[in-house]
């Protein structure tokens, strides 16, 4: 490979600055944007567990309980 840096014609932002430091600080790497991804994933996981719990509850009570 050549030592020449690519100009990244597809619009990507390089992950390192010319002096070798990361382009985005580690503190803010996972919390950029409107809502942190970990918060969205936690809420989604809790919603899935709630719905699965409703199915189990419904299988022991009501119409399908035998």
UniProtKB/Swiss-Prot annotation:
One Pfam family cited in the UniProt record for this chain: PsbJ
Compartments it resides in: Cellular thylakoid membrane
Example GO BP: photosynthesis
Chain ranges passing through the membrane: 37-57
Taxonomic superkingdom: Bacteria
Record-level GO cellular component terms: photosystem II reaction center; plasma membrane-derived thylakoid membrane
Keywords for this protein: Membrane, Photosynthesis, Photosystem II, Reaction center, Thylakoid, Transmembrane, Transmembrane helix
InterPro entries in UniProt: PSII_PsbJ (IPR002682), PSII_PsbJ_sf (IPR037267)
Protein's job: One of the components of the core complex of photosystem II (PSII). PSII is a light-driven water:plastoquinone oxidoreductase that uses light energy to abstract electrons from H(2)O, generating O(2) and a proton gradient subsequently used for ATP formation. It consists of a core antenna complex that captures photons, and an electron transfer chain that converts photonic excitation into a charge separation.
Quaternary structure (record): PSII is composed of 1 copy each of membrane proteins PsbA, PsbB, PsbC, PsbD, PsbE, PsbF, PsbH, PsbI, PsbJ, PsbK, PsbL, PsbM, PsbT, PsbX, PsbY, PsbZ, Psb30/Ycf12, peripheral proteins PsbO, CyanoQ (PsbQ), PsbU, PsbV and a large number of cofactors. It forms dimeric complexes.
Family the UniProt entry places it in: Belongs to the PsbJ family.
Protein name: Photosystem II reaction center protein J
């Amino acid at each position: 490979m050549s030592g020449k840096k690519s100009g990244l014609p597809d619009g990507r932002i390089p992950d390192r600055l010319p002096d070798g430091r990361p382009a985005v600080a580690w503190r803010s790497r996972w919390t950029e944007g409107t809502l942190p991804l970990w918060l969205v994933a936690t809420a989604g996981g809790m919603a899935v567990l709630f719905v699965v719990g409703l199915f189990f509850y419904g299988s022991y009570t009501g119409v399908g309980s035998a």
